[in-house]
């Protein structure tokens, strides 16, 4: 794919959709990251549907792009963070992020606290602490997977939302802070295995953090 091909395809999409569309950027060697200028052009042409972006370009590129996208308001409507919230606090404070689109529903109580503290202007001085607790939960890199899902599924199972910890796992996957990425489209279903010691630590962390949120 080229930038021109991406824009042509999305131009056709803009002609048929009737509701807001959130574009998600990415880090891929197979497809170029859509140019910010492209998003702006499309948002001008289709103001009722386009102008929403979940920014997940690689590393600091996501931050730089977010600043440019937010500078293009009101043509651009809303710019959201991604990558499991790893850079969310920085992006809230300095890049114009207006929310988080993520699979990390297992940590909803913490994510809610982070957002509410930010909305209040951090007048209680608890925003950094709340984000630090979130990072503690999601940064157990030596636990199974350590990517986007993996041991996080244990919390959903613990709360009775999931009946098991079976998840899609990419073959030849590499783990990064943004999740698990594989080559090609090959994947398998696998159950996340957690040792008794790891389970005890996750239970302890989760209980302590929920207790802190009740204060």
What residue ranges belong to the model's regions?
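Glycine-rich phosphate-binding "P-loop"
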Residues: 23-28, 49, 167-170
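Active-site beta->alpha loop and helix N-cap motifs at the rims of alpha/beta catalytic domains
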Residues: 1-33, 175, 190
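Structured C-terminal cap/extension of enzyme domains
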Residues: 90-215
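Catalytic alpha/beta core domains of metabolic enzymes, predominantly
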Residues: 12-17, 27-146
